[in-house]
Amino acid sequence: NRGRRRTTGSTGGSTGPATSPTGGSTGGSSYGRTGRHDLILRLATVEDLSDLYMMLLVMHSGTVDGTSPVKSEKLTSVISDALHRGIVIVAEVDGKIVGSIGGMETSDWWSDKLYLADLWFFVYKEHRKSRAALTLVKSFLEIGRDANIKVKLGHIYSGDIDRKDNFYERLGMSKVGSLYMES
């Protein structure tokens, strides 16, 4: 069953992960819930690697010009690392992944204080009007709170920056900087 567990009710309450980000691997843990349209959130497993890989290629194809090309081995390694040492949550509808957020604990270069940072956050275009994006981010934030560490989320290399900023701000997050690159 790939770590799925259905519960009834809204997507607001958490069944909680089996481990915190500091507790090691979360692959195979039970972390599911249902909401509207049979949306299921669950922790990803290694069985999801190829679906996540294909999803992230779609995400990359929608970025602005000037984005570095995908190196297959590196992308596979990063996904595998996140599956084994980080947090990867997938949203499913009818047994198919429609979105995901993945991240790792890290620290700023000047500090030992850990925070949970996203490596990716993506929902397929045809599911962006669903609650998938909202429930993925809320679950990621909840995992950080449960582990008593801050969460930092970002979005770069994509259009529609203002809409994405507003999305994060509606979740109580504050914008803390910008990223610039040569044209």
Outline where the language-model segments fall:
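A conserved beta-turn-beta hairpin within the catalytic core of GNAT-like acetyltransferases
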Residues: 107-118, 176
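A short helix-loop-beta-strand connector motif used in the catalytic cores of GNAT acetyltransferases and
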Residues: 78-90
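A short beta-loop-alpha structural element at the N-terminal edge
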Residues: 39-54
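Conserved acetyl-CoA-binding loop-helix of GNAT-fold acetyltransferases
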Residues: 129-142
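Conserved beta-strand in the GNAT
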Residues: 90, 96-105
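A short, internal acetyl-CoA/4′-phosphopantetheine-binding micro-motif in the GNAT/acyltransferase core
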Residues: 119-130
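Conserved GNAT-fold acetyl-CoA-binding loop/helix
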Residues: 57-78
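Conserved beta-strand-loop-alpha-helix junction that forms the acyl-donor binding cleft
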Residues: 152-164, 181-183
